[in-house]
UniProtKB/Swiss-Prot annotation:
Pathway: Amino-sugar metabolism; N-acetylneuraminate degradation; D-fructose 6-phosphate from N-acetylneuraminate: step 5/5. It comes from the Bacteria. It catalyses: alpha-D-glucosamine 6-phosphate + H2O = beta-D-fructose 6-phosphate + NH4(+). This is Glucosamine-6-phosphate deaminase. Its EC number is 3.5.99.6. It is an enzyme of class 3 (hydrolase). One of its GO terms (biological process) is N-acetylglucosamine catabolic process. The lineage of its organism: Bacteria, Bacillati, Bacillota, Bacilli, Lactobacillales. It comes from Streptococcus gordonii (strain Challis / ATCC 35105 / BCRC 15272 / CH1 / DL1 / V288). GO terms for cellular component: cytoplasm. Catalyzes the reversible isomerization-deamination of glucosamine 6-phosphate (GlcN6P) to form fructose 6-phosphate (Fru6P) and ammonium ion. Keywords: Carbohydrate metabolism, Hydrolase.
Amino acid sequence: MKIIQVADQNEGGKVAVEILRSKLAEGAKTLGLATGSSPLSFYKELIESDIDLSDLVSVNLDEYVGLEADDPQSYHYFMNENLFSHKPFKKSFLPNGKAEDAEEETEDYNRILSENPVDFQILGIGTNGHIGFNEPGTSFDSQTHLVDLTPSTIEANARFFETIDQVPTQAISMGIANIMAAKSIVLFAYGKGKAQAIAGTVAGPVTEELPASVLQGHEDVTIIADAEALSLLDN
């Protein structure tokens, strides 16, 4: 596990683009993408870079259940606004949050992931150590699944909605085993709110109670973080 301390999110985005550039030179074809505030600077730098995405495939970590793709709070909408409409991929896959049968959708998405193995996966991290929407207690063997969001995750995401009651209570998420199957992983963490989760991820016991701790067992993980997010780690 490699840790790169950056001054801020802007620098973090630049660093991640250069890591991606090196992976593309090694033949990477499929990118695993995330939503939320942490990867935004990466997408901005990627759009402004000379990297061509038109021959690449993307797969996203997750999507809320119950939101249409054109809902401004859906992750389809987020990705279109912040990356796809500026720099499209050859093909982009996201879970369908409006699928009639959510369990069937998880099976379909697992098939998509098996057909498009991820070479380079972007992650954020929740204050409770979740990656994707894999909440504490999620099995490390989990594949794409239907998730009941925890109160802390619903509260954290409420800032994107008019009221907390509008926040979806379920999501479809890649499982931890899906994430760990990626050849290379970059995780972003910014701010003191992420410090405890990062300390556990890097130096704590590997436990399903802190989902991101599983990354200790991956051979190619880079954490890009600011001083506040790294503040509980010993130098």
